[in-house]
Swiss-Prot record:
Homotetramer. Forms heterodimers with either ThiH or ThiS. PANTHER family: THIAZOLE SYNTHASE. It catalyses: [ThiS sulfur-carrier protein]-C-terminal-Gly-aminoethanethioate + 2-iminoacetate + 1-deoxy-D-xylulose 5-phosphate = [ThiS sulfur-carrier protein]-C-terminal Gly-Gly + 2-[(2R,5Z)-2-carboxy-4-methylthiazol-5(2H)-ylidene]ethyl phosphate + 2 H2O + H(+). The active site is at 95 (schiff-base intermediate with dxp). This is Thiazole synthase. Gene3D superfamilies: Aldolase class I (3.20.20.70). Its EC number is 2.8.1.10. It comes from Proteus mirabilis (strain HI4320). Keywords: Cytoplasm, Schiff base, Thiamine biosynthesis, Transferase. The lineage of its organism: Bacteria, Pseudomonadati, Pseudomonadota, Gammaproteobacteria, Enterobacterales. One of its GO terms (molecular function) is thiazole synthase activity. Its main location: cytoplasm.
Length: 259
């Protein structure tokens, strides 16, 4: 079980809604993933006419919708988008994204911290997308964020956990859930994140652009389940080769003495 703010999740796989060929395929893949939390950019929502073709299938699955502020370049823009999301979706949950860099979509740490503090004071449950910066994540926790979402590698890069050393520190030092977001390109990346100690991962591109998104969603679900089981069972601690003394798992001593 994973608890964030006032909600408990049985799935540690969060998903996105972008890049799918059709809304129907999106809904089928998300259902196959077992995800219970799905993020959607406010910039994709038609506030006048609604987005029933996108939102209705998600509601029918009973999935919690997490609007995000993707596209915001400043704290002011992000706060405005969050308020619109609260009105449009009747939710106080928000994924905070501020990335003025339109090429690499890297998060702005200063504006993110500023917006997070403002939104928490307004009663939002804030989940900020941020760089894998242990100091920043501590600051985000201190201002009241419900979780932190550090990147594994740049959005859409599918490069996996390029920031794993920093993620380890974040996981060790923070007492709120850590959700690895961005760069998860294969089920093995998601499994690694859970083995590191992350509480969940958010995956979009790797599922949406797969040749078979539904099958890929199932693969990610299996990877997340395996990662969680591995962590619960107690992983063997790696030993430096320079300090290692090999030990046979099936010694032959007693067998040979029998002869």
């Amino acid at each position: 079980m994973l608890k964030i703010a006032d909600t408990t999740f049985t799935s540690r796989l969060f998903t996105g809604t972008g890049k799918f060929a059709t809304p129907t395929l999106m809904a089928e893949a998300i259902k196959a993933s077992g995800s219970q939390l799905v993020t959607m950019a406010m910039k994709r929502v038609d506030l006048k006419n609604g987005n029933d073709d996108l939102i209705a299938p998600l509601k029918s699955l009973g999935i919690k919708l997490l609007p995000n502020t993707s596209g915001a370049k400043t704290a002011q823009e992000a706060v405005f988008a969050a308020r619109l999301a609260k009105e449009a979706f009747d939710t106080h949950w928000i994924k905070l994204e501020i990335h003025p860099d339109t090429k690499y979509l890297l998060p702005d740490p200063i504006e993110t911290l500023k917006a997070a503090e403002l939104l928490v004071k307004e009663g939002f449950v804030v989940l900020p997308y941020c760089s894998a910066d242990p100091v920043l994540c501590r600051r985000l926790e201190e201002v009241g964020c419900a979780a932190v979402m550090p990147l594994g590698s740049p959005i859409g890069s599918n490069q996996g956990l390029q920031t794993r050393d920093f993620l380890r520190i974040i996981i060790e030092q923070t007492s709120i859930p850590v959700v690895v977001d961005a760069g998860i390109g294969a089920p093995s990346h998601a499994l690694e994140a859970l083995e590191l100690g992350a509480d969940a991962v958010l995956v979009n591109t790797a599922i949406a652009v797969a040749k078979n998104p539904v099958l890929m969603a199932q693969a990610f679900k299996a990877a997340i389940d395996a990662g969680e089981l591995a962590r619960q069972s107690g992983l063997a601690v790696p030993t430096s080769i320079t300090h290692m003394q090999a030990q046979a798992s099936s010694p032959l001593t007693q067998y040979l003495e029998a002869f």
